[in-house]
Amino acid sequence: MNQPSLDKLMEKVDSKYTLVVLAAKRARALVEKQAPLVSVAKSAKPVSIALHEIVDGKVSYRQAKGGIK
């Protein structure tokens, strides 16, 4: 995983765990046919698209008392 860099991704979230959960949930939504929020190559995989969306600020999260919502 070279693009986007982990350093840039970590600027958008508070922990690596949050990053993994956020990317996984967004990738799952992409697999279920939601449209990508960024322009990427057609050969890009859902997790790669999700990471690009996170670093571009297109996907965000809010910390709930009981976990990520």
From Swiss-Prot:
Reaction it catalyzes: RNA(n) + a ribonucleoside 5'-triphosphate = RNA(n+1) + diphosphate
Keyword terms of this UniProt record: DNA-directed RNA polymerase, Nucleotidyltransferase, Transcription, Transferase
Enzyme Commission designation: 2.7.7.6
NCBIfam families: rpoZ
Disulfide bonds: none
GO molecular function: DNA binding; DNA-directed RNA polymerase activity
Presence of the UniProt keyword Nucleotidyltransferase in the record: yes
Name recorded for this polypeptide: DNA-directed RNA polymerase subunit omega
Cellular component terms per the entry's GO annotation: DNA-directed RNA polymerase complex
First-tier enzyme category under EC: transferase
Gene of this entry: rpoZ
Annotated source species: Heliobacterium modesticaldum (strain ATCC 51547 / Ice1)
Lineage: Bacteria, Bacillati, Bacillota, Clostridia, Eubacteriales
Signal peptide: none
Functional description taken from the UniProt entry: Promotes RNA polymerase assembly. Latches the N- and C-terminal regions of the beta' subunit thereby facilitating its interaction with the beta and alpha subunits.
Superkingdom of this protein's organism: Bacteria
Cited Pfam families: RNA_pol_Rpb6
Family membership: Belongs to the RNA polymerase subunit omega family.
InterPro entries with a match to the protein in the record: DNA-dir_RNA_pol_omega, Pol_omega/Rpo6/RPB6, RPB6/omega-like_sf
Complex and partners: The RNAP catalytic core consists of 2 alpha, 1 beta, 1 beta' and 1 omega subunit. When a sigma factor is associated with the core the holoenzyme is formed, which can initiate transcription.
GO biological process: DNA-templated transcription
SUPFAM superfamilies assigned: RPB6/omega subunit-like (SSF63562)
